[in-house]
């Protein structure tokens, strides 16, 4: 099909503008965040080293590899999450019966004695490994470690929460979350994935993602509120970061996410935090299904993909529902106020309209 020259000219301008935006704004943001991560990780590593001295079951999985830290996730430019992997989940069965969308429990295997578990004192009378009890013990250890840490003048434990959150230099919050890595298994609640007859992701990539597995996190969550208090304390949150990152390899997918995060920081940091990086990542995965061919993820198409994601976001905000990519029964807008969602919808539409109607939009964004 012949494309009119004026359309090619518009597309070339858009590609140029997006590349310029990436070089000037996105890479600046990434550089600033990398600098902050290096600064805070030195302090967090020191705290976790002291924790490990007191309690060898809690081993730091925050490691530096080729100049980058693995095991830390950027939630916002000032809020980070470090996942601390625990050892020896083996004597427990993973129970994912759908009664707690987005969560699961770990139950002592039939015939296994409590004494066979490394985590014996955290097992409830019903045989569940309690996420809350492990977190409570870890909280105590971190509080003691902060007092002994050489950086104690610049790090404090955030009070009035069961979660372990460190405030560093009065500016950055780092949440440290105990977790189990579940490799070689896939949750029943995500068994429908991938949807049949959609060419993306390729079966080889699906097999890779499923063998990589998922994580179980010990953290407070809006998805558990209002449930049985005991179950809420024992339950672990399903977490698919590794799987999601694996799916976003190839083409301009990760670059697209970096641009979305930069636009979010600059234009969608709104009251009530209705839009997070995770919402954007989720909608990017849905956009990958809608546009399965690799040719649809090159430099020439990135403007269309950004618009597609923002239009999806407007629809989700107006319907007040954003389904999790792997667990669609889980609404990622749960707990967000309708007013905040309505306000966000207007801001996203303004941003989307700007990108759609002006080839110079990225100069102003």
UniProtKB/Swiss-Prot annotation:
Gene3D superfamilies: 1.10.1410.40, 3.30.460.90
Family as reported in the entry's similarity comment: Belongs to the mab-21 family.
PANTHER family, per database record: CELL FATE DETERMINING PROTEIN MAB21-RELATED (PTHR10656), PROTEIN MAB-21-RELATED (PTHR10656:SF70)
Protein name as it appears in the record: Protein mab-21-like
């Amino acid at each position: 099909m012949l494309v009119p020259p004026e359309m090619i000219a518009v597309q070339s301008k858009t590609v140029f503008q997006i590349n310029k935006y990436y070089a000037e704004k996105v890479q600046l943001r990434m550089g600033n965040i990398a600098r902050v991560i290096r600064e805070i990780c030195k302090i967090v590593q020191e705290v976790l080293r002291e924790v490990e001295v007191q309690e060898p079951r809690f081993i730091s999985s925050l490691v530096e590899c080729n100049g980058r830290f693995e095991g830390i996730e950027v939630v916002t430019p000032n809020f980070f999450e470090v996942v601390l992997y625990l050892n020896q989940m083996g004597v427990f069965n993973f129970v994912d019966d759908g009664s707690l969308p987005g969560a699961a429990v770990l139950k002592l295997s039939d015939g296994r004695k409590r004494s066979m578990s490394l985590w014996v004192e955290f097992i409830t009378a019903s045989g569940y490994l309690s996420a809350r009890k492990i977190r409570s013990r870890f909280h105590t250890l971190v509080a003691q470690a902060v007092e002994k840490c050489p950086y104690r003048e610049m790090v404090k434990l955030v009070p009035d929460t069961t979660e372990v959150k460190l405030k560093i230099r009065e500016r950055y919050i780092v949440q440290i979350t105990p977790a189990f890595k579940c490799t070689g298994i896939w949750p029943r609640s995500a068994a429908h994935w991938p949807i049949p007859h959609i060419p993306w992701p390729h079966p080889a990539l699906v097999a890779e993602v499923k063998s990589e597995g998922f994580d179980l996190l010990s953290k407070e969550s809006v998805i558990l509120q209002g449930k049985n208090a005991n179950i809420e304390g024992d339950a672990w949150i399903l977490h698919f970061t590794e799987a999601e990152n694996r799916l976003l390899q190839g083409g301009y997918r990760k670059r697209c996410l970096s641009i979305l995060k930069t636009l979010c920081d600059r234009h969608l940091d709104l009251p009530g935090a209705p839009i997070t990086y995770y919402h954007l990542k989720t909608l990017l995965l849905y956009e990958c299904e809608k546009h399965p061919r690799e040719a649809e993820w090159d430099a020439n198409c990135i403007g269309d993909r950004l618009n597609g994601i923002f239009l999806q976001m407007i629809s989700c905000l107006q319907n007040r529902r954003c389904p999790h990519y792997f667990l669609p029964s889980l609404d990622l807008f749960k707990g967000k106020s309708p007013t905040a969602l309505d306000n966000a919808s207007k801001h996203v539409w303004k941003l989307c309209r700007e990108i759609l109607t002006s080839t110079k939009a990225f100069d102003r964004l």
